[in-house]
UniProtKB/Swiss-Prot annotation:
GO terms for molecular function: ATP binding; tetrahydrofolylpolyglutamate synthase activity; UDP-N-acetylmuramoylalanine-D-glutamate ligase activity. Gene3D superfamilies: Mur ligase, C-terminal domain, Mur-like, catalytic domain, NAD(P)-binding Rossmann-like Domain. Pathway: Cell wall biogenesis; peptidoglycan biosynthesis. Transmembrane segments: none annotated. NCBIfam families: murD (TIGR01087). This is UDP-N-acetylmuramoylalanine--D-glutamate ligase. The gene is murD. It comes from Rickettsia felis (strain ATCC VR-1525 / URRWXCal2). It is found in: Cytoplasm. Keywords: ATP-binding, Cell cycle, Cell division, Cell shape, Cell wall biogenesis/degradation, Cytoplasm, Ligase, Nucleotide-binding, Peptidoglycan synthesis. Cell wall formation. Catalyzes the addition of glutamate to the nucleotide precursor UDP-N-acetylmuramoyl-L-alanine (UMA). Pfam families: Mur_ligase_C, Mur_ligase_M, MurD-like_N. It is an enzyme of class 6 (ligase). The lineage of its organism: Bacteria, Pseudomonadati, Pseudomonadota, Alphaproteobacteria, Rickettsiales. InterPro entries: Folylpolyglutamate_synth_CS (IPR018109), Mur-like_cat_sf (IPR036565), Mur_ligase_C (IPR004101), Mur_ligase_C_dom_sf (IPR036615), Mur_ligase_cen (IPR013221), MurD (IPR005762).
Amino acid sequence: MNSHTKQKIGVFGLGKTGISVYEELQGKCDVIVYDDLKANRDIFEELYTNNSIAALSDSRWQNLDKIVLSPGIPLTHKIAGIAKNFNIPIISDIDLLFEKSKNLNFIAVTGTNGKSTTTALISHILNSNGLDYPVAGNIGVPALQAKASKDGYILELSSFQLDLVKTFTAKIAVLLNITPDHLDRHQDMTGYIAAKSKIFDRMDKDSYAAINIDNYYCREIFMLLQQEQRIKLIPFSVTKILKNGISVVGDKINDNDISYKLPFNKNLQGTHNCENIAASYAVAKIIGVESKKILESISSFQSLPHRMQYIGSINNIGFYNDSKATNAISAVQSIKALDNIYWLAGGIPKEGGIEEIKPYFSKIKKAYFYGQAKEIFAKTAKNIVDFVICDNLEQAFDLAYKDAVGDNAEVKNILLAPSCSSYDQFKNFEERGELFMKLSKRHCEEITK
């Protein structure tokens, strides 16, 4: 990385991102590192025997050319104060990847919900059609660990990551939706929207932005960019057919004034996935993939784990894992896509609880609440939908399964859409989803014995 050769650089945060940054920079410049968590420092010392760890009291932090901050570190942290006091620029791993690959196309995807599925769907479409676009970023692959590419990268970017970027410039940017989230980090919606809007920074007339104009906050950003006239804009909608833009309404995808039949894919059910499809189609068309080829790729897409993941169906009971639905807005999307639902929800509740889901309670046959949120959710559901309070996810699943087996309805669905973060009982949403999948498969095996 020539632009950083012989510079003094600090890496703060030693999770996956921080480690990837250190591995990129070591031997090319003078690097010091730190993490507030002793466990992360210990892991680093096991991996690397050199003396790179320096506490923030070390004066070397005051004499750096740059500090690379991991996205989990808020800008209110002491390290940000040191950077400000000593005029040290804070950058991100996203900037580092961009600076060494400026000749390639960068596709950036953000939004409160749907980022990972859209990122994966774009990648599937492009790579199925002979192009080379690895994914990286918030999807679980640190930017600097993305495999080498000849065409470009598709980056899923969270508001935390966008807060840190300084030089990164997207060729194509996607804004899926904005709803209240991470307000503890951004203070209020104004701060959150400002962070999301940074995806369009430094883009010019040769760049493209695909924006969901059904969403109020996204529409406001779209209109502001229209006034600026510095980016080529492609609006998309799932509620109305646009004469100039991309629409997914019913079983049709409309590309300006041309309509195509949308292939059914059980892994892409629900309004939220219509948004993901519209955005992915727009990006693929910009890149130059033919409409017919895009539709073929959509039909063969396999959903990501824990994101409205269809696990299987037996005796008319379908099992759906939407563990990634960590807020009510996200859970609404999976609930809207199904009927006769045995709903598993709980964990650490987000602001507003499940109020957003109340209009869709008629789709829920019975709810099973667990974790810290169980009493709060029960209060919202009282006298509207039948529910049971459970100790944990496993108990909730067992009760839901028993009730579904006894239901004579033609179609029944057991849905994990927690509407909460997972940290009261699990390490993360992935561990929560893995347990649900294990339980689903175990019960399917019992039925078939």
